[in-house]
Every structure is written in structure tokens, then in C-alpha cells.
Amino acid sequence: MTLNDVPVRFDADAHTYTMVDGTVLSGVTGLLKERLFPTQYAGVDPEVLNNAAAYGSAVHRMCEAYDTVGAYPENEDLHAYVGVKNEYELEHLCSEYLVSDCEKYASCIDKVYEVDDNTVDIADIKTTYRLDKEYVSWQLSVYAYLFEKVNPCIKVRNLYAIHIKKGVGKLVQVERKDVIAVEGLLYTTEPMNVDPYAMPSKWREREDELIKYTHLMEVYKRKVEDI
């Protein structure tokens, strides 16, 4: 399978996307922060964020080196990634694949995995303490939309987060947002239609704890009723 290229240059140091005619494009992560997740890391110490970013970048580089040239240093996080790939039989096609609408936006997809001659899965590697599945869902939904614009004969099947932390790797499938929602995010300034019953982000980050707490409360309630 051969993927199409876009006339966009990515400067990794400055993290900028520029078309060959000089037009500067916006990245998807900045858009998500501005439109949907403005308080995602509010209150977090900048040093903590910087350390987390450095750790995440190191893991990304190791995974890319493994997929592209077979480099396999002794590292628990790389072992976790390789374990996920082997368990789910992910066939690496491309890393850091650049997609764009060539009008306003461009971004690099961490991983593209080949499914068959005209189908791929895409994935983003996350190294955060807790995985924000709603964020990844939006991020990869936009990536899938742009991917299919660049490659109209290839369909994106599944969207995955590959969550790696302290030597443990998990493959988590996330929902793909519909095209209307994605285009609304990309090309309108209207407020996003947010589900009023959706879990607030600060609670979503503690979802596992809340589920455990809810279960314990149900057990306690049954015990009280039995008295």
C-alpha cells in the first residue's frame, strides 16, 4: 500500500506546518485545546508537564525507531509497545504520517497500520498517567478525516490509543466522531454541541476511581438493606 504525500513541510523543532507556497497551517492539538479542552491541564505544575512531555517524546522516538529500522534497545516501555503490536498483530505501515486539508490544518499521525489493500487502522501513542479517551477520540477522528481526504481510496477502520506507562502497554479502541461533528470543529466558530450529560473532564480523568467508588456504594447499600 502506498500513501499519498501532501505539499506541507513539518518543522519538528518549531512544531509548525507550512505549505510549499508559504501558507502556515494550524495543528490539530492546538485546535482541540482551544475549542474543546481548554482546561485539560489547568493547575498542573509546568515542570510536571515538561517532564511528562519529555518522557512522551522519548517513548515516541523509540517506537518510531523500532518500526522504521528495527532498533530494539533494552527499555520496558518499548517492550510494552512491541508486546501490544504482537498481541494484536498490528502491521506497521507508516509512522508520523503527515496529513492535511491543504487549507487550514495539518498534523502527523503517530501510527498507521495496514489492514488490507484499501483499509488501515490509525493510532496515537499516549504516555499520560490516565488515558483521556474522549480527547483521543476527537484527535483521531480529525486525523481519520484528514487521512481520507489525502487518500480517498483508503478507508480508516479503527481508531486506537496505545497507552504506555511504566512498562505496561494497552490498546484502547476509541469512538470515531461523525463527519458533521468533525467538520463543525474544523470549519466553524460555532460553540460545539457538547453532551450536557457527559462526564466533566476532571472527573473523566478519575473514571476508574469513580467506578470503584460507585460499586462500593452499591455493595454498602445492599448490606444496609439486609440489616
PLM-predicted stretches and their roles:
Residues L93-P191:
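Mg2+/Mn2+-dependent nuclease catalytic core
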Residues M192-P200:
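DNA replication initiation modules
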Residues H15-M19, A161-H163, D226-I227:
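Short polybasic amphipathic segments
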Residues E47, N51, L131-Y135, S201:
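Conserved aromatic-histidine-acidic binding/catalytic patches
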Residues M1-A106:
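Metal-dependent nuclease catalytic cores that hydrolyze phosphodiester bonds in DNA/RNA
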Residues D67, E148-P152, E218-K221, E225:
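Hydrophobic/aromatic-lined pockets within catalytic cores
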Residues V59-H60, K111, Y143, Y213:
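A residue-level signal for conserved active-site and pocket-lining positions in enzyme catalytic cores
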Residues M199-I227:
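Contiguous, amphipathic alpha-helical segments that mediate oligomerization or scaffolding
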